[in-house]
Curated annotation (Swiss-Prot):
Compartment list: Cytoplasm
InterPro entries for the chain: ScpA (IPR003768), ScpA-like_C (IPR023093)
Subunit-level organization: Component of a cohesin-like complex composed of ScpA, ScpB and the Smc homodimer, in which ScpA and ScpB bind to the head domain of Smc. The presence of the three proteins is required for the association of the complex with DNA.
This protein's UniProt keywords: Cell cycle, Cell division, Chromosome partition, Cytoplasm
Broad class of the protein's primary localization: cytoplasm
Entry GO CC: cytoplasm
Organism per entry: Enterococcus faecalis (strain ATCC 700802 / V583)
Domain of life of the organism encoding this protein: Bacteria
Keyword Nuclease annotated: no
Biological process according to GO: cell division; chromosome segregation; DNA replication
Protein name (record): Segregation and condensation protein A
One Pfam family per UniProt: SMC_ScpA
Amino acid sequence: MSFLQEINLKLDVFEGPLDLLLHLIQKLEIDIYDIPITAVTEQYMSYIHAMQTLELEVAGEYLVMAATLMAIKSQMLLPKQELEIIDDEDFFEEEDPREALVAQLLEYRKFKYAATVLHEKEEERKLYYTKEPMDMDDYKEEDTTLPPNQINTIDLFLAFHAMLEKKKNRQPVETTVASDDVSIEEKISAISERMRQVQKGKAVSFDSFFDSYSKQEIVTTFMALLELMKTGAIYAEQENNYSEILLFNTETQQEDTTEVEETQ
């Protein structure tokens, strides 16, 4: 079994391809009724390619959606035609190839919202007791909405893919496995130590963790960063869709003006 095959990481980021598409639409701040299919397809394929680079299993439904997006993109590139019917002044325009996808997204968003409301009601119901009212403030759920500029693991996947593309342009990524393998646990320990040394109010550039051109080293580092984000030890911020991603130590970070730590 290869090194990458031994990696066992479950990423509960999305419930399916429609969930991923909704995230991308929100991230790109676009109108769901007028989806720029080229931009969305590029972002979607970046996520798929990142998963394949890490040799993580990509569910078939994601690949089906990828094929659907590519088909829609191809149709959108074809010259628009108008079919004349009976009266020369009346025209029947071709159906927008995005129409079926938009309908699916709207339907999914509706049911997702309903599921969220039902879950909130269920959680509220758990706080009801058949005794005298009492202060339940200490038992309220924390707000899980990410603060402004803070990003989640899917954005990190997209940044990871972009970083790999930049490395390919500079020098091919080595695919051989070195004899002195570093485990994910060891890499987590090394990254944690580095983050502990970061002063309050400062951040570390995401790209600064990827000096190596070894595929094993790159993948191990990325897996370690994902695990640290999952456990809440670190968090990531990005000012806008194309700016640098910064990593912060959750324990020591304060609401100060941040500076990017120089690459060590």
